[in-house]
Amino acid sequence: MALSGQDWRRHQSHRQHRNHRTQGNHQKLISTATLTLFVLFLSSWIAYAAGKATVPAPLVEGETESATSQDFNSSSAFLGAIASASSTGSGSGSGSGSGSGSGSGSYGLASMNSSPIAIVSYQGITSSNLGDSNTTLVPLSDTPLLLEEFAAGEFVLPPLTSIFVSIVLLIVILGTVVGNVLVCIAVCMVRKLRRPCNYLLVSLALSDLCVALLVMPMALLYEVLEKWNFGPLLCDIWVSFDVLCCTASILNLCAISVDRYLAITKPLEYGVKRTPRRMMLCVGIVWLAAACISLPPLLILGNEHEDEEGQPICTVCQNFAYQIYATLGSFYIPLSVMLFVYYQIFRAARRIVLEEKRAQTHLQQALNGTGSPSAPQAPPLGHTELASSGNGQRHSSVGNTSLTYSTCGGLSSGGGALAGHGSGGGVSGSTGLLGSPHHKKLRFQLAKEKKASTTLGIIMSAFTVCWLPFFILALIRPFETMHVPASLSSLFLWLGYANSLLNPIIYATLNRDFRKPFQEILYFRCSSLNTMMRENYYQDQYGEPPSQRVMLGDERHGARESFL
């Protein structure tokens, strides 16, 4: 039984509301999963940093014992051991040992009433016997390797913690690969997504994919081995790819923000200029700028291959001038541009929403008899003119207001962006009713614009939280005014890498134009992907699928023929 046009539109309205609730639940689920992974990642690194906390070096000959005792009391590792066992001790000699014990030579004295525990002093190792309070003196040369490393001021990461951190980092790497590969496959397979406005999104996905494949695996090995065993040549190549890919990812984010800003503030002018050739040129400029930042250490300055003790390391060039140049070009300038651009986009979106609410209020008053369509405060009712620029945007002129509906996936979680120009012109459909299809579509676009404002906050928050700590540390390190623990440096570095995992989630998964292809690709239902996307787009525009619309048109055509 075929539904009438009015019944079908009512049915589609209920269906759209149900779909919106389902999409909201999906977004909450994705956000919760992302937050959980982020918290898991952060907690693992906190445990990793706590485990790698080093203890002060052993007492060297000629060092004052008071300084040794002061350094020892500042060590959190030994304070925890001392707090867990009540120790009292006494000894002879000229030196005082750790805690309340004292010792001399290469031995330390301690007395404990709890379970057997070994405490490393700066002059030796003390160990208590089980069941009595006698103290056994153990020379440092006779202690196990782990205790020797404790005495030497080093710490071996517990195996379980190391395995846990490695698993979390592997999950980050695999998630980054899967997410960005899905973006590339979706754009290649779906004709609707092969538009110039998505070229930068593909470039972003490729840069993040390179981070996951070329940078993260070596960084994981470096973390596990805790030293660089692959030679200076491979170190230079790895560092160059690291700087190149991470900088390209950040600059792609900046270019996307500028692209969206121009599409909203200058829709008519920029819509014509946004051609495939120019977007490819923009992508080339992004990668060229990233190369200009990554190549100087490889070709001219050189990277760091040894630390002060001669141990092999692999660190980017710490030249002060280069660090200023690299941090400004890779982060601080793009961050400033993105903050300005997204603030302007947020203001434009808010202004549009307020103008459309005001226009709808005037129109409602006119229809209820409290106002008049020809009154000065209400714009005249008119018809809607639509024009397509051929690159993914539809321009609509209604009264005194010019609107642009961008069908390119970007900031809006619904897959579109709405821009307005004018001093508050009115909005009306050809029927002059608030329940007309034009007003339903307009309300739908305004709802998407509100979601876009929320997405802006997510974008800036994720980008800033992930990369700001690392680049603050990058500016501090060349001054050598403070010692930065290696675990803290690793945490900030991997936090920046995690941004490559969040990018496909924020820029693609929250966008309906990408979310549906992702689902179909993951379920291996790619044969009818373009047909399904075309039907969804048709339904969003007209409120009914093509088959039903054709059927209703045939019914009206048959009724007209019978009347004639």
UniProtKB/Swiss-Prot annotation:
Sequence repeat positions: 89-90, 91-92, 93-94, 95-96, 97-98, 99-100, 101-102, 103-104, 105-106
Agonist binding: annotated segments: 238-247
Transmembrane parts of this sequence: 29-51, 165-188, 199-222, 237-258, 279-302, 331-353, 455-476, 488-510
An annotated GO BP: male courtship behavior, orientation prior to leg tapping and wing vibration
Binding site for ergotamine: 242, 247
Listed PROSITE patterns: G_PROTEIN_RECEP_F1_1, G_PROTEIN_RECEP_F1_2
Feature: compositional bias, Basic residues: 11-23
Membrane topology: Multi-pass membrane protein
Distribution of this protein across tissues and organs: Expressed predominantly in adult heads.
Regions of this protein lying in the Cytoplasmic compartment: 189-198, 259-278, 354-454, 511-564
Annotated Polar residues bias: 386-396
Start and end residues of each stretch annotated as 9 X 2 AA tandem repeats of G-S: 89-106
UniProt cross-references to CDD domains, sorted A to Z: 7tmA_5-HT7 (cd15329)
Principal location: membrane
Coiled-coil residue spans: none
Signal peptide (UniProt feature, chain positions): none
Motif DRY motif: chain residues: 259-261
Pfam family name, one: 7tm_1
GO cellular component terms attached to this protein's record: dendrite; membrane; plasma membrane; synapse
Ranges spanned by the short sequence motif NPxxY motif, renumbered to the chain: 503-507
Region listing for Disordered, in residue ranges: 1-26, 367-396
Topology feature Extracellular, residues: 223-236, 303-330, 477-487
S-S bonds: 235-314
Role: G-protein coupled receptor for 5-hydroxytryptamine (serotonin). Also functions as a receptor for various alkaloids. Ligand binding causes a conformation change that triggers signaling via guanine nucleotide-binding proteins (G proteins) and modulates the activity of down-stream effectors, such as adenylate cyclase. Signaling activates adenylate cyclase activity.
Family listed: Belongs to the G-protein coupled receptor 1 family. 5-hydroxytryptamine receptor subfamily.
Name the UniProt record assigns to this protein: 5-hydroxytryptamine receptor 1
Name of encoding gene: 5-HT7
